């Protein structure tokens, strides 16, 4: 363990206790107000690994995330279970083919003014998916240059043409590309499932906080064990039928409109 990773783990451990206390109080508030509902697993899933390219999984790059000694083995477990049932597996990587910010036709908008996009040229080693979780034959690697995997890509086309109802999302980062992909997925009618041991980020506490918030509002955060058990219990993918409608949820009564005193 390096000094840097040791410091990260120490801060993460100390933050965990504080965050758990905050989450316990927050969960009561959310439950009382009708949040934190479960969207549940559907019948016809796909897996998408968000930005598990070398820039995020290997040391030495500005985008590197710690915790890969946990993340990579859990991603491998999900791949093994998904492939055994013929479940589609997709990957994304952020790449930039026109990085000239002054050209007026760059493919990153103003993102270059916030993050070091110049360190991630297309076709570089850093933009390639980590060999430990390399795509199998026929699995698609989607190039993107936005946070979410949906805008400007064919992901939604791939999912709808395969009649996908559930999207299992892994990768990095929790606060950025994973979160935005999950938010877009639920808005487009897919059931987002996030295996908690497969999510990374660069700063202590960020993964824990974002998974808590995602679980309250945008998707179901589950253990990798639960996701693998779900995949293991599925029939072969070609024998599944999508579950398109959400399960009934308890309704919360809307508060009455506020009554304002007549102004004189």
Swiss-Prot record:
Q: Which Gene3D superfamilies match?
A: Isochorismatase-like
> Main EC class of this protein?
hydrolase
Q: Where is the active site?
A: 177 (nucleophile)
| Residue runs in coiled coils | none
Q: Which UniProt keywords apply?
A: Hydrolase
Q: Does the keyword Hydrolase apply?
A: yes
Q: What is its EC number?
A: 3.5.1.59
Give the pathway. Answer: Amine and polyamine degradation; creatinine degradation; sarcosine from creatinine: step 3/3
The Gene Ontology terms for molecular function here are: N-carbamoylsarcosine amidase activity
Q: How is the cofactor bound?
A: Binds 1 sulfate ion per subunit.
Do you know which SUPFAM superfamilies this protein is assigned to? Answer: Isochorismatase-like hydrolases
The record ties this protein, via Pfam families, to: Isochorismatase
Region described as Disordered: spans on this chain: 240-264
A biological-process GO annotation: creatinine catabolic process
Query: CDD domains this protein is in?
Result: CSHase
* Cofactor(s) named in the record: sulfate
Q: Whom does it interact with, and what assembly results?
A: Homotetramer.
Can you say what this protein is called?
N-carbamoylsarcosine amidase
* Naturally occurring in which organism (per UniProt): Arthrobacter sp
Q: What are the top taxonomic ranks of the organism?
A: Bacteria, Bacillati, Actinomycetota, Actinomycetes, Micrococcales
């Amino acid at each position: 363990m390096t000094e840097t990773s040791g410091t990260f783990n120490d801060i993460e451990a100390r933050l965990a206790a504080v965050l758990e206390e905050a989450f316990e109080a927050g969960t009561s508030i959310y439950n009382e107000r009708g949040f934190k509902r479960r969207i549940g697993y559907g019948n016809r899933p796909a897996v998408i690994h968000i930005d598990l390219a070398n820039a995020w999984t290997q040391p030495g790059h500005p985008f590197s995330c710690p915790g890969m000694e946990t993340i990579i083995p859990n991603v491998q477990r999900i791949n093994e279970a998904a492939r055994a049932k013929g479940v589609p597996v997709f990957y994304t990587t952020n790449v930039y083919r026109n990085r000239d910010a002054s050209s007026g036709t760059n493919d990153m908008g103003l993102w270059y003014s916030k993050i070091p996009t110049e360190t991630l040229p297309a076709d570089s080693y850093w933009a390639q998916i980590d060999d430990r979780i390399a795509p199998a034959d026929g699995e698609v690697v989607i190039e993107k240059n936005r946070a979410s995997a949906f805008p400007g890509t064919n992901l939604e086309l791939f999912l709808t043409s395969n009649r996908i109802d559930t999207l299992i999302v892994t990768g990095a980062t929790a606060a950025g590309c994973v979160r935005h992909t999950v938010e877009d997925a639920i808005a487009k009618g897919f059931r987002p499932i996030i295996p908690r041991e497969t999510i990374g980020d660069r700063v202590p506490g960020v993964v824990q906080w974002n998974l808590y918030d995602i679980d309250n509002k945008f998707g179901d955060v589950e253990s990798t064990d639960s996701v693998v058990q779900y995949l293991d219990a599925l029939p072969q993918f070609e024998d599944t039928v999508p579950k398109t409608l959400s399960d009934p949820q308890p309704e919360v009564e809307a508060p009455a409109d506020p009554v304002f005193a007549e102004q004189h």
